[in-house]
Amino acid sequence: MNQWVSVDLFAGAGGASTGLRCAGLEHAVCVEWDEDAAKSLKAAGFPAVHGDVRDLSHYEDIERVDLLWASPPCQAFSTAGERKGALDERNGWPWTLDIIDHLQSRGIGPRYVMCENVPGLTYHKADCTGDVEQCPGCYWEGWIIPEFKKRFDWVGHMMLDAADYGVPQHRRRIFLVAGEGPVKWPSPTHGPPNIALQGTMFGSPVKPWKTIRDALGMEKFIGGGRNPTPRENDKRTYRDITNEPSTTVAAVTIGNAGPFVAQPGSEPWRLDKPSPAVTCRDDKGARHQKFDPSKTPMTAADATWRAAGVRRLTWRECAKLQAFPDDYPFEGRTKKSLYRQVGNAVCPPIAEILGRMIIDALEQ
């Protein structure tokens, strides 16, 4: 049996690394700039390097790379920010390609590359003029994809929602794969309860979405008004509106972002659905409103879990919505750091599924 070797760039606290390890890949190195996140990586047993991914000395002892995973900083492209795109100083795509060139020049791979980023990377600006330096969508179509096609025989990409693969959170991300040949993208394993039922009856079965209640066990927050326990004639209403995953966990630490959980006596949120986009901020704001799950959540302030009477989810609760193991050894000197690490992470189950997909391609 082959031992497949991976390199993790912009590794954060280890979400992708954890998933890839579960899939059966062995890490040669995991590089992360943030000191606390690098400590978390090391505590979790990964070969962590605290440093700049552009420092090529980090890769000198590597003899083979089967998969290079990269999660370049998303702030340059997120719809929650200014979307400076290619000109943003945090744009890590050129750095990723430089590392690929370095490894290929030594003849050690990578055989496949997996890159993860926010959907906003693929969206065109309203005032788009076709300039790849000014419009993220043009940068994606006119520079990123062509640059990978120069280096690999096959390039593909797909948007995935973590909730469709067993994570109790709606977290949409674009995944780019480049390598020796096509991959077979994973089919969803979970879906809305009605789709799950139809699938069982008429096609490939999927399980119902995992929910906030599944992850956090918050039965006591179903109550409404001043009474934390709904009246008998309210039970159907509250049951019917409580079926949803969380929204995306993000990593900003200012403003009035959630996620929040209703305090006893407050109006309930949809606990029996996947969480909305959970923003990992230390909440200091005063504006709280109910999140409208019918709207597409953004990564920052709009992508929150809010209610009339609220408390901020703890960073450990956020980690549960990211589907980290309960005992994952996050290291951090401040709550701000811990929230940021959790919110920046790739959901481990998604990385595991995609890691298995890459292994299947490697074994062809």
Segments (PLM) and residue ranges:
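Conserved SAM-binding strand-loop segment of SAM-dependent methyltransferases
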Residues: 46-52
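Conserved acidic E/D residue at the C-terminus of a beta-strand in Rossmann-like folds
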Residues: 31-34, 116-117
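Conserved SAM-binding loop
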Residues: 41
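Acidic-aromatic/histidine active-site loop/patch
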Residues: 351
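Short beta-strand element of Class I
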Residues: 27-28
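Class I S-adenosyl-L-methionine
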Residues: 56-67, 74-283, 292-302
